[in-house]
A protein has these predicted regions:
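Sec/Tat signal peptide C-region and signal peptidase I cleavage site
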Residues: 23-27
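Bacterial N-terminal signal peptides
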Residues: 11-22
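Primary mode marks residue(s) on the alpha4-beta5-alpha5 output face of response regulator receiver
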Residues: 29-198
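Bacterial N-terminal signal peptides that target proteins for export
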Residues: 2-13
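Intrinsic disorder/low-structure terminal segments
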Residues: 5, 20-22, 165, 191
Length: 198
């Protein structure tokens, strides 16, 4: 069963905000490969970024409802935070976030408008499943493709126009931008390895 955090239309919007990928509710099916125990969640979260970050990062578990508390699985000593894949998401997609990106997530989850004054960076070493064209709803498996390990960047709204020159098509492995459904703020995705490369 999905947690209250990710149920319903509101929860779906929050999920989109959290992971920056424009999935539809039709893609939100439980995945039996998702971590369940705390040990599994920690292992999953540690897959999300480079070891020089993950080895000292704080590991959190997602709150069970909107506005809820994140549960600390391991207290870290650097400024990075890693989380396992989102419960109930169609694919397991853990991430590691710098303080700006993490604050952006927390603001979004709490229903606050994110206020960031500098760029925020996130790693997704496991990659993610995204639409063939950024912003297109996924209605079937044939609509989606896997973006390999990548970095994501969010920026303050005053910098948005600088992102508009990037392509919105992420299917060719090149850097691209996308925006949330019903939103205009762009975020930048920088793949650095194809998903099938070892």
């Amino acid at each position: 069963m999905k947690s209250d955090l990710f149920s319903g239309r509101c929860g779906m919007t929050l999920t989109l905000l959290l992971l920056l990928f424009p999935y539809t509710a039709k893609a939100q099916t439980a995945n039996s490969n998702h971590p369940v125990t705390d040990a599994e969640k920690m292992t999953d979260a540690l897959r999300a970024g480079p070891k020089f970050i993950t080895k000292d990062a704080t590991i959190l578990d997602w709150p069970v409802k909107a506005g809820g508390e994140y549960r600390v699985l391991r207290k870290g000593t650097n400024e990075w935070t890693c989380l396992p894949g989102v419960p109930g998401y169609s694919h397991d997609e853990p991430g590691c976030f710098d303080p700006v990106f993490m604050q952006w997530i927390k603001d979004s989850l709490a229903g606050r408008e994110p206020h960031i004054t500098t760029i925020g960076i996130a790693y997704m070493y496991v990659g993610a499943w995204v639409p063939a064209k950024s912003g297109k709803d996924i209605t079937s498996k044939s609509d989606e493709f896997h973006v390999g390990p990548h970095i994501m960047i969010v920026s303050p709204r005053e910098n948005q126009k600088e992102l508009q020159s990037f392509s919105r098509d992420g299917s060719n492995g090149m850097p691209y931008v996308a925006h949330l459904p019903n939103g205009t703020d762009l975020y930048l995705v920088l793949p650095f390895r194809q998903w099938d490369e070892k």
